[in-house]
Amino acid sequence: MEADIITNLRCRLKEAEEERLKAAQYGLQLVESQNELQNQLDKCRNEMMTMTESYEQEKYTLQREVELKSRMLESLSCECEAIKQQQKMHLEKLEEQLSRSHGQEVNELKTKIEKLKVELDEARLSEKQLKHQVDHQKELLSCKSEELRVMSERVQESMSSEMLALQIELTEMESMKTTLKEEVNELQYRQEQLELLITNLMRQVDRLKEEKEEREKEAVSYYNALEKARVANQDLQVQLDQALQQALDPNSKGNSLFAEVEDRRAAMERQLISMKVKYQSLKKQNVFNREQMQRMKLQIATLLQMKGSQTEFEQQERLLAMLEQKNGEIKHLLGEIRNLEKFKNLYDSMESKPSVDSGTLEDNTYYTDLLQMKLDNLNKEIESTKGELSIQRMKALFESQRALDIERKLFANERCLQLSESENMKLRAKLDELKLKYEPEETVEVPVLKKRREVLPVDITTAKDACVNNSALGGEVYRLPPQKEETQSCPNSLEDNNLQLEKSVSIYTPVVSLSPHKNLPVDMQLKKEKKCVKLIGVPADAEALSERSGNTPNSPRLAAESKLQTEVKEGKETSSKLEKETCKKLHPILYVSSKSTPETQCPQQ
């Protein structure tokens, strides 16, 4: 049986090894095919880059030709536009001159017409006033003639003296009335003249306002003409500058230096075109890599989510197993309870039998009482032990329940953690997608990579000095406290001393210090730096590490990690070589202190 089992296991082992070898072969084939595909892809990419560069160069030459032709067309169109503008300017000037002359003539005629109107109004008013005066004088004459006639008649009738006096007063009053009427008429005439003068002045004011507006329009037209003249002056200045530049053109003069500069500029433009093409191809490659990283993140998130569900299933299986175990324990306890009940029933039956035969066994009462007392004591002890056992069981159940609650909380927290990790990965993937969609491509400043170089120490110490310094450092670092050494026994102290010496010997070898800034004093750091080979690394590696810790999708992490690994390997190789060379030369020097310590006293005792 055992031989069959061994043969079966060997067969299974062979099958597993064969399957492993097949899997390794398939993996190698896949890797080789992937490498071939990558090489083909690189070749195709290089071919595409060369083709695009050639097309871009042709495009650049054609653009230059098109630019030259467009410049010629622009120059011709500029000349045509200049001639048109000159003709337009001439026409505008003529129109302005004609409009100005016409406006001046119109203004002169308007002023003449207004003057004639004013004179006409004044003549009409004077004529009206004179007519009114003539009519008034006629009325006065008629009144005076009537009065004279009346007076003559009354005189003839021989009126009394009183009547004559009254008549004289009446005539005087009438004369005063007439004089007052004349004054009123004169004042009315004066008022009419003033009103006419006011109307004339208002007309003059309106005319002056119109003239002012016309003068303002003329000033605006003059200002526009001045601005146009300034623009024309600027155009002429630009044309003059262009003419000066054309006069100073190196191609026209045939200067070799400027021609060389022009050739260099054309070469730099071609190089710029090639760099642009390469940049576009690398940009597309970067976008493809980002998409692959996005897919990987989504796959990781789904795997984390599946892992969370798997852990939940494992927890369920574990809880079911614990439930089955507890059910078995409960069944076992129920069986024990039944056995105890049977034993109790038998004990009660045994106690009932001696009570029936009590009349026959009166002599053996002493032994029965003694046994009864022992049984009672044993029962009490059993009950106390049962109580303690029940208390312990309750405590155990309480602790198990508490442990189960803690485990449930732990599994719930783990599940929440995994779900949160998966959600975090999904959110990161979404954030990367949104960045790729909406954020513009930032100008990435390419860091200038410094070359790695080895800085050898100037003041090289001898092997003995190095051993002395290293032994002093080892003694300072690996020195045990005296209190602990006194408490230990002599053999242990000797063994510790040997271990201490071995440690100090192992530490005396110089090491390549990749991070010299540790918890050491300044003078010790200086001593170590004199004995070590410094590696001045590339600053881009630190940036790559920082970007790696931040999980930024934009940073080329794989290249930075590979560079870092290669540099660390080179540093290790150089450090191992230096260790081998120094281990051959260095020998540990032991220093024994003059004071008596327990380490030195134990061998003497």
Curated annotation (Swiss-Prot):
Region (Disordered): 544-580
Residues with N-acetylmethionine modification: M1
GO CC, alphabetical: centrosome; cytosol; nucleus; outer kinetochore; spindle pole
GO molecular function: enzyme binding; kinetochore binding
GO biological process: cell division; cell migration; establishment of mitotic spindle orientation; mitotic metaphase chromosome alignment; mitotic spindle assembly checkpoint signaling; protein localization to kinetochore
Sequence ranges of Basic and acidic residues compositional bias: 564-580
Record-listed Phosphoserine modification sites: S513, S515, S555
Keywords, ordered alphabetically: Acetylation, Cell cycle, Cell division, Centromere, Chromosome, Coiled coil, Cytoplasm, Cytoskeleton, Kinetochore, Mitosis, Nucleus, Phosphoprotein, Ubl conjugation
InterPro entries, A to Z: SPDLY_chordates, Spindly/BICDR_Dynein_Adapter
Domain of life: Eukaryota
Quaternary context: Interacts with KNTC1 and ZW10. These interactions appear weak and may be transient or indirect. Interacts with dynein intermediate chain and dynactin (DCTN1). Interacts with the catalytically active form of USP45.
Protein name from the UniProt record: Protein Spindly
